[in-house]
Regions:
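Conserved catalytic cores of very large enzyme subunits
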Residues: 2-750
Length: 750
């Protein structure tokens, strides 16, 4: 058993014998069931720094979305010396560390693909280095090049037609959450020692492929840990030993996260479940009288300020998929422990309070791990913050905890992972709506008119027959699932080989569990299309080649989103059927296959490449996002819509089920207290049914329309909304995506 003087006052034994942050938390945290009255406002330092950062953000917006970009230096742990928000204010920064040498400057990260790194530069008027081009073209292979070299013609065709899209073959896969708390609790030297022991115990026998690879990966992890120490030294800190107080705990933890974002540009770079962990240090300092509540809030405000600054250089096709510059610095608060104790601490309040001290913001992606058993005061405070800022998402702790335990993090938008124990292979989405059209048209793509899918016999009847369509759809789904898994196996193999996440994996157990994430797009449209074929009459409209390019519906049919089992059961069937098809395939590195119903803002891109559907959706128009009902389908109010989504079993979609709802303020009540109370009741009822996720927006469409027409108004500079799986500044969306958000249902009644 090891012991450090920095651990004075901390209880427990197991976490001192092995790397076990959960045990440390359970033995030392202080549940809080009071209200928010203890919270402190922003300090003068916070106001000055946030004011300086807002000026930089305004300048960034004026320059078209990018303030500055690196073109000569490849990002690494030690590529840069120290950087600050404002050199003249650097002594005010309680938490330090930038991705590059300047605030909001985007790093050059070519290992995912030199073409992408260069295109990101030229898109915004920057000229990339000719020398780096030669190095990463002639001498060093990148992830992107390796993937495309190995793709089959069928894979390329599926990618081109967007029946599979958004794949992490042109960007870092992300979704790996290092247990950044370990840096604070143990210090880097102890973590190196633990990894060296793993290395010594790996490969004492036959040198198989797996053993050789693991030894190399552990060696890279140890090197990354050493690099983290050098990175911190540039800022004058020695992180070799554990943190001795709250400020060091916040700083050490942030350095761990900074190492990740300096070396990877993953689509999701989550922070993880840190609030209750940090509260232990803050509470110890408060009890000892060496920290005030105002100083504690300042630490959290400054840490969150850093999360709000995370930026990556992206290409236009990426921005179409993931609009508004998200990084998914997802950070969780709340939850209930396995022993039944609430894990709400004062620090959970402090993180939510940053949205009041510094205003709404998309990052970090604040996530409440919700249960109706959470303290009432905390539920009401979270609901109040949601109503005021539309910046918070909620996930059902009661359905996730039996699967992931009580120390999981959200590793992207809505997907859970056991902190420090697991990693996830991110896999984008398959277009199940386009797949239905392939089933009808015999694998011919309705947009390109090319044979993309297998050359099965098309449906040629004038009116679609459910008993004919369904088996053909199942057959085509099975083809798509097989191709999809093969594509992802190839991508994940190449990412491990050419763009391995050693900084993050250094903070995860060596004996790591892996999940293989897949996803579904067009979910509600498939449900309603099959329902229309089954319960109404759907006539196929064909072009001169016989291809079905449109549909006429005669009669009415049950629609998903109205608490009608006839439609909702089709959704349950679709989810289960697709997951079973995925699960029967071989997945890379013995990973466990999961799926999600989640689209991000790629619902617009998917729709743009998908023809008219039998549910009445027009050709090449946006899909409904995530697990949301189709636009205009919801006729029975918010609660009926929520009930439909709640019927989807979480255990068949362990990668997450995203549901985004917009509620007119008057629908919730006519006073702040009434609205807060009603929102809590809505969420209690929704999550008690076993539903997984809810994005809450509280505003009317008039505000969206005004923000779209007058983005220059000061009130809209930080106007934040929740979209499928994340939050975004509304004025940072493209006009097309703004119109998509405006077209969604805004519930005027519960």
């Amino acid at each position: 058993m090891i012991n450090f003087e920095q651990w004075e006052g901390f209880e427990g034994r197991i976490w001192k014998e092995e790397v076990n942050v959960r045990d440390f938390i359970q033995k030392n945290y202080t549940p809080y069931d009071g209200d928010e009255s203890f919270l402190a406002g922003p300090t003068e330092a916070t106001d000055k720094l946030w004011g300086a950062l807002q000026k930089l953000q305004k300048a960034e917006r004026a320059k078209g979305g990018v303030l500055d970009m690196e073109t000569e230096v490849v990002s690494s742990l030690t590529a840069y010396g120290p950087g600050y928000i404002d050199e003249s204010l650097k002594d005010l920064e309680q938490i330090v560390g930038l991705q590059t040498d300047k605030p909001l400057k985007r790093a050059f990260m070519p290992y995912g693909g030199i073409k992408m790194a260069e295109q990101a530069c030229t898109t915004y008027g920057y000229q990339p280095s000719a020398e780096l081009h030669k190095i990463f073209t002639d001498y060093t292979r990148t992830h992107n090049q390796a993937v495309f070299d190995a793709y089959t013609p069928e894979m390329k065709a599926a990618r081109h037609t967007h029946i599979i899209t958004g794949l992490p073959d042109t960007y870092g896969r992300g979704r790996i959450v290092g247990d950044y708390r370990r840096v604070a609790l143990y210090g880097i030297d102890a973590l190196i020692k633990f990894k060296q022991e793993d290395f010594a115990n790996c490969g004492d026998g036959t040198m198989t492929d797996d053993v050789i690879r693991l030894r190399e990966e552990i060696a890279r992890q140890i090197s990354a840990l050493k690099g983290m120490k050098k990175m911190a030294e540039a800022y004058g800190y020695d992180i070799s030993q554990p943190a001795k107080n709250a400020k060091e705990a916040c700083q050490w933890l942030y350095f761990g996260y900074l190492a990740a974002i300096k070396t990877q540009n993953g689509a999701a770079m989550s922070v993880g479940r840190i609030s209750t962990f940090l509260d232990i240090y803050i509470q110890r300092d408060l009890d000892q009288g060496i920290l005030t509540e105002s100083e504690a809030q300042e630490l959290i405000d400054h840490m969150v300020m850093k999360f709000r600054m995370v930026k990556f250089a992206r290409i236009p096709s990426y921005n179409q998929l993931f609009s508004g510059d998200p990084v998914w610095a997802t950070l969780e608060v709340g939850g209930i422990g396995m022993d039944g104790r609430s894990m709400v601490t004062k620090n959970c309040y402090r993180f939510l309070h940053t949205l009041e001290n510094m205003g709404p913001a998309p990052e970090p992606n604040l996530t409440v791990l919700y249960s109706s058993a959470l303290p009432e005061a905390f539920k009401k405070y979270a609901a109040k913050v949601s109503i005021d800022t539309s910046s918070v998402q909620y996930e059902n702790d009661d359905v996730m905890k039996p699967v992931w335990g009580d120390d999981y993090s959200i590793c992207c938008c809505v997907s859970a992972t056991q902190t420090g124990k697991e990693m996830q292979f991110f896999g984008a989405r398959a277009n199940l709506a386009k797949c239905l059209l392939y089933a009808i048209n015999g694998g011919v793509d309705e947009k390109s008119h090319e044979q993309c899918g297998p050359n099965y016999a098309p449906i040629t009847s004038e009116y679609l027959n459910y008993d004919e369509v369904l088996p053909k759809y199942v057959q085509m789904l099975d083809w798509l699932a097989g191709l999809y898994v093969n594509v992802l196996n190839l991508i994940q193999y190449m990412h491990d080989k050419y763009y391995y996440e050693e900084a993050e994996m250094a903070l995860i157990d060596t004996d790591v569990r892996r999940t293989f994430a897949t996803g579904i797009a067009g979910f509600s449209h498939v449900i309603d299309s099959l329902s229309a074929i089954k319960y109404a009459k759907v006539k196929a409209l064909r072009d001169e080649t016989g291809l079905a390019t449109g549909f006429e519906i005669e009669g009415d049919f049950p629609k998903y989103g109205n608490d009608d089992d006839r439609a909702d059961e089709i959704g349950v069937w679709l989810l289960k059927t697709f997951l079973e098809m995925i699960k029967k395939r071989h997945t890379y590195r013995n990973s466990e296959a999961t799926t999600s119903i989640l689209t991000i803002t790629s619902n617009v891109v998917y729709g743009k490449y998908t023809g008219a559907l039998p549910d009445g959706r027009a050709a090449f128009t946006p899909f409904a996002p995530g697990a949301n009902p189709s636009y205009g389908a919801e006729q029975n109010g918010l609660l009926a819509s929520l009930n439909s989504v709640a019927k989807l079993p979480y255990h068949w979609a362990l990668d997450g089920i995203s549901n985004t709802q917009t509620i007119n303020p008057d629908a919730l009540g006519h006073s702040e207290g009434e609205r807060t109370e009603n929102l809590v009741q809505v969420m209690d009822g929704y999550f008690d049914q076993g539903a997984h996720h809810l994005n809450v927006n509280v505003f009317g469409k008039e505000k969206l329309l005004d923000a779209m027409e007058h983005p220059e108004k000061e009130e809209y500079a930080n106007f934040t909304i929740r979209v499928s799986g994340y939050a975004v500044k509304f004025i940072d969306l493209t006009r097309e995506q703004q119109m998509d958000v405006i077209s969604r249902t805004c519930h005027a009644a519960l």
